[in-house]
Design a protein with these regions (language model features):
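Solvent-exposed interaction patches of small proteins and small membrane subunits
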Residues: 2-111
């Protein structure tokens, strides 16, 4: 999860929404990392998610599902806002939890 959020941060740094709209490679890279982030969140044990309900896990996973299954309905403006505004906030929420995630029992698969 940290890798995906870090990559998104690097990708959007010094870029504009206009470049996101017009650059297919850039847009695809951001969307792929959001997919990875959502899949990693989906692999967390329900007990871990419940213990950290301050994180909106369902939205993280839900976005992954929209990108993968409803790709023709993606709202680019919303994805841009998520990548530039919500992912940095999510990073702040998840970073303190990383020690728990790397201990046995935090995840069901590597993140």
């Amino acid at each position: 999860m940290m890798g995906a959020m870090g990559a998104i941060g690097e990708f959007v740094q010094d870029r504009t929404y206009e470049s996101y709209q017009t650059d297919l490679l850039f847009r695809s890279a951001v969307e792929r990392q959001l997919e990875i982030l959502g899949e990693a969140a989906n692999r967390l044990k329900p007990e871990f998610q419940a213990a950290h309900s301050e994180v909106d896990w369902s939205n993280v996973v839900g976005l992954r599902n929209v990108i993968i299954h409803q790709y023709d309905e993606i709202d680019y403006e919303e994805i841009w806002a998520i990548a530039t505004e919500r992912v940095p906030l999510l990073l702040e929420q998840i970073q303190p939890l990383m020690s728990e995630l790397t201990e046995e029992g935090g995840v069901v698969a590597p993140i």
